[in-house]
Each structure stands twice: as structure tokens, then as C-alpha cells.
């Protein structure tokens, strides 16, 4: 199993060399940007660079608005809240992910339910999700998905 996974990752990067978890890429202007940010005195959640990033994201995605977050975990947490995830809910996710995914679910007071991954894409398997839902869930009169065992909402 692991050999297949390692081969899949190496094929994506077209290399047999070491594949780092994170390899920073710098285009040469980082020192200038950091200096400009420090000189502006806006070094956290506001300032010219944050405003520019949000404008660029709106333009790129075509969305009405964009809000920069401190990190991916915070972004996932907000996204889950906006999706209606509440305390006691179950949230289907995949086990082959960064821990932030499960942490964000837990921050909402919900519980992650791990559904198998697709061997070809390494993303959540639609077939596995369908099988689990058909075996373990029902749609209530309000159109919500609930767990057969204890009626918890599945998001």
C-alpha cells in the first residue's frame, strides 16, 4: 500500500528524489515586501498587502468578497461554520489529510467521520461516501442527513 502511495506522489512530481512536505519558493522580492510591511506598521491582519491579496482573490475567483485568514485551519473553521456545522454534528472527511481538517471540525464541536480515499486521486472516494451514507444515514423530514444509529446530523 505504501509503495503505491509513494509511487503516486513521485509520479506527480516526476522525480525519484526526496519530495519535501513543503518547499518554499521565493521570486526575489520578499525582502522588499517584508521591509515595506514593517515600515507601514501593519504587520498582521490589515494593511496594503492584505488588501491587495483580498482584491486579487475576488478578481481571480469572481466572488463578491474575499477575507484573508491567519492560516488554513482558521479558514476551514470559518468555512465549516458558514456551511452550518454545529456542535454534535458529524462531518464526513478523509483520513489522508492534514490534521487541520479534523481540528477545524472539532473547533465547531462536531466530530469527523473518516471515509476512505480514492486510490487514483487520493481524494475522498465518492463511492465510499455513497456506500457509507446508504448504509448509515437517512434524510429526515427537514431534508437533513442524519445518522441512523443516533439521529445526529451529518454535514
Located regions from the model:
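N-terminal "arm"/small-domain region of PLP-dependent enzymes with the aminotransferase-like
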Residues: 1-43
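Conserved coil-to-alpha-helix start sites within the AMP-binding
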Residues: 97-102
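Structured binding elements
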Residues: 109
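ATP-dependent adenylate-forming carboxylate-activation enzymes
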Residues: 117-132
Amino acid at each position: 500500500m505504501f509503495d503505491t502511495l509513494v509511487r503516486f506522489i513521485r509520479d506527480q512530481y516526476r522525480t525519484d528524489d526526496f519530495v519535501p512536505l513543503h518547499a518554499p519558493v521565493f521570486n526575489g522580492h520578499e525582502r522588499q515586501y517584508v521591509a515595506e510591511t514593517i515600515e507601514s506598521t501593519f504587520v498582521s491582519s490589515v494593511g496594503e498587502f492584505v488588501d491587495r491579496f483580498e482584491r486579487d482573490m475576488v478578481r481571480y475567483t469572481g466572488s463578491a468578497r474575499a477575507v484573508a485568514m491567519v492560516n488554513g485551519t482558521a479558514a476551514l473553521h470559518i468555512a465549516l461554520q458558514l456551511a452550518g456545522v454545529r456542535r454534535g454534528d458529524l462531518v464526513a472527511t478523509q483520513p489522508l489529510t492534514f490534521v487541520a481538517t479534523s481540528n477545524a471540525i472539532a473547533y465547531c464541536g462536531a466530530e469527523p467521520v473518516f471515509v476512505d480515499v480514492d486510490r487514483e486521486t487520493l481524494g475522498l472516494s465518492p463511492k465510499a461516501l455513497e456506500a457509507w451514507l446508504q448504509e448509515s444515514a437517512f434524510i429526515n423530514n427537514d431534508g437533513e442527513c442524519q445518522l441512523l444509529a443516533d439521529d445526529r446530523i451529518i454535514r
